[in-house]
Amino acid sequence: MQIILLEKVVNLGNLGDIVKVKDGYARNFLIPQRMAKRATPAAMAEFEARRAELEKLAAEKLAAAQAVADKMNGTVVTVARKAGMDGRLFGSVGNADIADALKAAGYVVDKSAVRMPEGPLKAIGEFPLDVALHTDVLANITVAIVAE
């Protein structure tokens, strides 16, 4: 299916690109999330008429995400969990726990934005993580896990 991207999509393209994707990806994800439209002649004409407005919105989103990232960089978030004598946690600290801790610190972040390449954290200590605030903006934070 041919679609017009209404915003930047990772590994697919930028605003205004016309790309071919599988039908299910377009119908079930891109179109409902308002990231894309079908590439019909009418939709293309409408997009070209609104291109400047959409580019302005995309630039505003990027600027807002960059401002939040500037404030968030270097933030240390502390999470308390029960742990054994050897420093291993009873359970783990995942994306949702870190998103809740960031919310308590005054940052509104979706749990899917927290990047944990090694998976959930299962030990006491300090761990550097990235938070994806926008497709082009990453904030670096440190998660400190302490024993209760």
UniProtKB/Swiss-Prot annotation:
The keyword Ribosomal protein applies. One of its GO terms (molecular function) is rRNA binding. It comes from the Bacteria. InterPro entries: Ribosomal_bL9, Ribosomal_bL9/RNase_H1_N, Ribosomal_bL9_bac/chp, Ribosomal_bL9_C, Ribosomal_bL9_C_sf, Ribosomal_bL9_N, Ribosomal_bL9_N_sf. Keywords: Ribonucleoprotein, Ribosomal protein, RNA-binding, rRNA-binding. One of its GO terms (cellular component) is ribonucleoprotein complex. Disulfide bonds: none annotated. The keyword Cytoplasm does not apply. One of its GO terms (biological process) is translation. Binds to the 23S rRNA. Belongs to the bacterial ribosomal protein bL9 family. This is Large ribosomal subunit protein bL9. It comes from Dechloromonas aromatica (strain RCB). The gene is rplI.
